[in-house]
């Protein structure tokens, strides 16, 4: 049965207009984005199938074009739509973070980092540079690569903070393997960085570890020096 044959109150677009986007399931939201299904499969059916295949909305929206194209009805057009949605979401979160007082709004920081880093396939490290009011000045990528390649030089982070006239900073990196638990190397690096930053009167406020499902804060774990 096509969506046009559904009762009007159950059609995703009509349901959104009547009840708001929050009332829709992941599959219904995705169906609106897909617009059409395939032969014998409505847009909602296709959305449910894709969500089951990829395991989550985040993994589906972050899939590479080659992987998407393996599924009937998907291809470069869908990849482009998903990339646009991801980037719009990232920019909205960045705007909210820019306007917020970071320490009083840790959930916004966590949401931004999960959206920014959670679906990365390799380890990526970033720095969030803050002013005296703990508002965001800039986000800078520090490194990108495998764990073996992902050596961050402390002096480069110190120089970055000074170049941006930051009063404090937050660092974050993702664990592509899925576990947010800090390693001993993560803990030791954080201690050395905090010590180095203190020499130039810049505070290291927190270190976050990000996965697709969760965000771990060193400060909340009591691991900040």
Swiss-Prot record:
**Gene Ontology biological process terms from the UniProt entry:** proteolysis
Query: PANTHER family recorded for this chain?
Result: DNA REPAIR PROTEIN RADC, UPF0758 PROTEIN YEES-RELATED
InterPro entries named among the record's database cross-references = MPN (IPR037518), RadC_JAB (IPR025657), RuvA_2-like (IPR010994), UPF0758 (IPR001405), UPF0758_N (IPR046778)
Q: Where are the disulfide bridges?
A: none
Q: Which family does the entry's similarity section mention?
A: Belongs to the UPF0758 family.
Q: What is this protein called?
A: UPF0758 protein NMB1038
What is the taxonomic lineage of the source species? Answer: Bacteria, Pseudomonadati, Pseudomonadota, Betaproteobacteria, Neisseriales
**What region holds the MPN domain?**
102-224
**Has the keyword Protease been applied to this entry?**
yes
Q: Which organism is it from?
A: Neisseria meningitidis serogroup B (strain ATCC BAA-335 / MC58)
A molecular function (GO) term = metallopeptidase activity
The short motif JAMM motif is annotated over: 173-186
The record's section on Pfam families has:
RadC (PF04002), UPF0758_N (PF20582)
CDD domains xrefs: MPN_DUF2466 (cd08071)
User: Coiled coil located at which positions?
Assistant: none
Ligand binding (Zn(2+)): 173, 175, 186
Keywords assigned = Hydrolase, Metal-binding, Metalloprotease, Protease, Zinc
